[in-house]
């Protein structure tokens, strides 16, 4: 797969800088490492903030969902890698309007661990927060083990619905309730038509024929449950 890149090891930072340079009316970089993308305008006082985050390589998730009535900020990790605890904490600080912050993201081990620790950090700064996990991928675990399912396409619906609830100035408990109701109602399955090429690796992650597709594959090329 051909790509236009300067340096495959720097492309995430260059991508984020380019995004904010191209659309300063929508986005700004934040955080010590510049790995937080936040809304360009300051969050309204008394509004619940909504944050998400995860690895790069899933556009338009996550940066494409930062905006009015959507996410207030997101933390961006390397390709297929979770953002750090500090980056997630920075995203939460950017989204804090004094009414608490909802952490709304996919059910992936590294993201869960780091967002939980970021929430604990913000709690020490007197910032209240809550969590809703998206686990809509029916191919990744059985119905009896739904808590193990990954979050994929359902994130887009949850961002929009929870974002609208926050924009209407509902409190944190109500925004969390609406987000959880949305998450519980989302079910999806992935279909991979072609393999992806991680820039640092320079070769496809798997092989698939032109007349085939892989059903149930995750966003980071995880296989479906057997």
Enumerate the predicted regions with their spans.
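Generic secondary-structure signature for well-ordered alpha-helical cores
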Residues: 17-28, 71, 75-76, 93, ...
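Glycine-rich oxoanion-binding loops at beta->alpha junctions
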Residues: 58, 67-98
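Gly-rich Lys/Arg/Thr-decorated short loops/hinges at beta-loop-alpha junctions or inter-strand turns
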Residues: 45-53, 62-75, 139-142, 213-226
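A structural-propensity feature for long, helix-poor, extended segments
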Residues: 85-107, 113, 141, 146-160
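Internal, active-site/partner-interface "lid" segment
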Residues: 140-149, 159-220
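Short, acidic/small-residue loops that bind anionic groups at enzyme active sites
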Residues: 74-79, 123-148
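N-terminal amphipathic/basic leader segments beginning at the initiator methionine
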Residues: 1-49, 210
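Short glycine-rich or small-residue beta-strand-to-loop segments that form or flank ligand, phosphate
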Residues: 2, 48-55, 71-74, 100-109, ...
């Amino acid at each position: 797969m051909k790509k236009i890149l300067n340096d495959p090891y720097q492309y995430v930072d260059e991508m984020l800088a380019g995004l904010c340079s191209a659309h300063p009316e929508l986005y700004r970089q934040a955080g010590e490492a510049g790995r937080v993308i936040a809304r360009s305008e300051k969050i309204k006082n008394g509004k619940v903030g909504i944050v998400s985050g995860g690895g790069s390589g899933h556009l338009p998730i996550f940066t494409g969902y930062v905006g009015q009535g959507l996410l207030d900020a997101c933390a961006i990790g390397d390709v297929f890698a979770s953002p750090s605890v500090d980056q997630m904490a920075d995203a939460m600080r950017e989204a804090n309007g004094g009414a608490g912050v909802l952490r709304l993201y996919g059910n992936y081990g590294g993201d869960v661990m780091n967002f939980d620790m970021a929430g604990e950090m913000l709690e020490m700064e007197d910032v209240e927060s809550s969590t809703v996990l998206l686990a809509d991928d029916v191919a990744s675990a059985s119905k009896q083990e739904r808590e193990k399912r990954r979050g994929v396409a359902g994130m887009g619906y949850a961002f929009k619905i929870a974002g609208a609830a926050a924009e209407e100035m509902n409190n944190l408990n109500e925004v969390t309730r609406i987000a959880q109701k949305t998450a519980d109602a989302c079910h999806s399955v992935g279909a991979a038509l072609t393999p992806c090429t991680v820039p640092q690796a320079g070769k496809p992650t798997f092989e698939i024929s032109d007349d085939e597709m892989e059903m149930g594959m995750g966003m980071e090329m995880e296989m479906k449950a057997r």
